[in-house]
């Protein structure tokens, strides 16, 4: 089967790894450095998040899936740059019929106008806090994520970017009716909407490393 589609391969011959271990390889690819168990390096998306101001309400860095390697903690996240540069996580399956991004859900009984009011109240309270440089890193990241969540909840353009129902059934079929295929389509929509970096968890619908065939390759 692989021979039949070999003409479609794009080989990157300059790319190599110093290790055959998957977890260390993840870190190498996502962070551009070898694994250091004492310091977690930031990923490419985190660096882009640092260098480019967020185009509110669209987050600069999005990850589709629950990226937790069995051996290592979230390679490619904020690392030593801080949690504020972690990706916006979408753990829901984009291939499910009821897929939706929970950040767009407002609290029960709270309409958009009240959400805007809460956002302004939060900003007012933040002005009475210490400057960002004097806050704990966790507090700074909490403020960032809260602001991001409120922006998403009140943005029609952001909701549209995450809405796969706007694509034709034919195109969705071409991308593949599975978690990865629909994730690829969603990633394209997000990049077009202004997200600078999107990562997709490479599992299909098996819950394991579906790309890594240690056995059963040949019939």
Regions found by a protein language model. Give the residues of each.
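Ligand-binding pockets and gating/stacking loops
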Residues: 1-219
């Amino acid at each position: 089967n692989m021979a039949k589609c070999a003409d479609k391969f794009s080989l990157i011959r300059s790319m190599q790894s110093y290790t055959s271990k998957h977890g260390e390889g993840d870190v190498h690819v996502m962070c551009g450095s070898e694994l250091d168990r004492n310091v977690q390096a930031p990923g490419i998306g985190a660096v882009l998040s640092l260098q480019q101001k967020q185009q509110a309400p669209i987050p600069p860095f999005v990850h589709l899936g629950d990226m937790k390697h069995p051996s290592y903690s979230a390679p490619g996240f904020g690392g030593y740059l801080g949690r504020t540069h972690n990706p916006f996580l979408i753990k829901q399956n984009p291939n499910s019929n009821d897929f939706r991004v929970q950040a767009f859900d407002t609290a029960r009984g709270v309409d958009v106008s009240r959400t805007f009011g809460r956002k302004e109240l939060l900003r007012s309270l933040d002005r009475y806090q210490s400057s960002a440089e004097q806050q704990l890193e966790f507090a700074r990241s909490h403020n960032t994520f809260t602001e991001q969540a409120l922006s998403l909840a009140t943005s029609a353009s952001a909701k549209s970017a995450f809405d796969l129902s706007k694509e034709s059934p034919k195109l969705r079929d071409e991308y593949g009716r599975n978690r990865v295929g629909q994730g690829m389509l969603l990633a394209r929509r997000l990049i077009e909407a202004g997200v600078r970096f999107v990562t997709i968890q490479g599992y299909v619908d098996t819950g394991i490393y579906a790309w890594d065939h240690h056995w059963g390759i040949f019939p």
